A protein has these predicted regions:
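Catalytic Walker B motif of ABC-type/P-loop ATPase nucleotide-binding domains
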Residues: 166-170
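ABC ATPase nucleotide-binding domains
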Residues: 231-261
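The feature captures the beta-strand-to-loop junction immediately N-terminal to the Walker
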Residues: 43-45
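Conserved ABC ATPase signature
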Residues: 141-145, 149
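Conserved ABC ATPase "signature" region
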Residues: 104, 119-137
Length: 261
């Protein structure tokens, strides 16, 4: 269930883009190209515009300046090729919905509204459950799953739309260390299967072990197509001390405000 053909054009191409809300500019002069098979991690402080960037890519927020193409099209048209896992997904623990039914929601779309699910839909759902290693939980109520398992269900739901690009906003924000590692391993597998991934994360100590390249976004984007989290990137993006792990030992990356004391 991997994409059948590679795109001649980038999946996402952003040039000199600025965007925001009312009179507040949140993103400024953003340039980013997402190529097929990329696995890009975006780090940065809260309020730095990471979620806003996702809204622009999904066509939910128009840019105030610059251009963006998704699959060579306007985001409103190209987003049908995108699977999205939001930062927070509300669910009613008293509602007896099964895991399989949650994943099946990913098959909804303009072509499926008011139509019964097909045998093809059911097959895709089962494949997605297998991809996130939850086949045995298909008939279980969602409320019985752990936080990490629920997050894998939401990833499966996004995969059910058979996307070429997967956007994930803080996929490990509410899970423990073990579940975090499992989710990143899962995303690594999905990327190897041909799905391009762009994710937001605060797990600086984990993210560089799995993604192919890293960028730091704090209103402006510091991205050079490299995997290493550099001191310059942290200083430019955070403007504060950040603890990283190097060779198994914690060390502090000093940012500008300490240097200027």
């Amino acid at each position: 269930m991997t994409p059948t053909a590679a795109h001649a054009t980038p999946l996402v191409e952003i040039r000199d883009l600025s965007a925001g809300y009312n009179n507040e500019m949140v993103l400024k002069d953003i340039n980013l190209t997402v190529e097929p098979d990329d696995f890009i991690g975006l780090i940065g402080p809260n309020g730095g515009g990471k979620t806003t960037l996702f809204k622009v890519i999904l066509g939910l927020l128009p840019p105030q300046k610059g251009t963006i193409k998704v699959m060579g099209m306007a985001p409103e048209k190209g987003r049908r090729h995108i699977g999205y896992v939001p930062q927070f997904t509300y669910y009613d623990s008293d509602f007896p919905i099964r895991v399989r039914d949650v994943v099946r929601m990913g098959r909804l779309g303009p072509k499926h509204l008011f139509k019964p699910y097909t045998a093809e839909d059911d097959q895709v759902v089962e494949e997605c459950l297998e991809r996130v290693h939850l086949t045995e939980k298909g008939n279980a109520p969602l409320r019985e799953l752990s936080g990490g398992q629920r997050q894998r269900v939401y990833i499966a739901r996004a995969l059910a739309s058979e996307p070429e690009l997967l956007l994930l906003d803080e996929p490990t924000i509410s899970v423990d260390v073990e579940a975090t590692a499992q989710i990143y391993e899962l995303l690594h597998e999905i990327n190897l299967q041909g799905v391009t991934i762009l994710l937001i994360s605060h797990d600086l100590n984990v993210i560089s072990s799995y993604v192919k390249t890293i960028g730091c976004l704090n209103r402006t984007l510091h991205y050079h197509g490299e995997k290493e989290i550099t001191a310059d990137m942290i200083q430019a993006g955070y403007n504060c001390p950040v603890e990283l792990i190097a060779h198994g030992l914690p060390h502090r990356v000093l940012a500008r405000h300490e240097e200027q004391r």
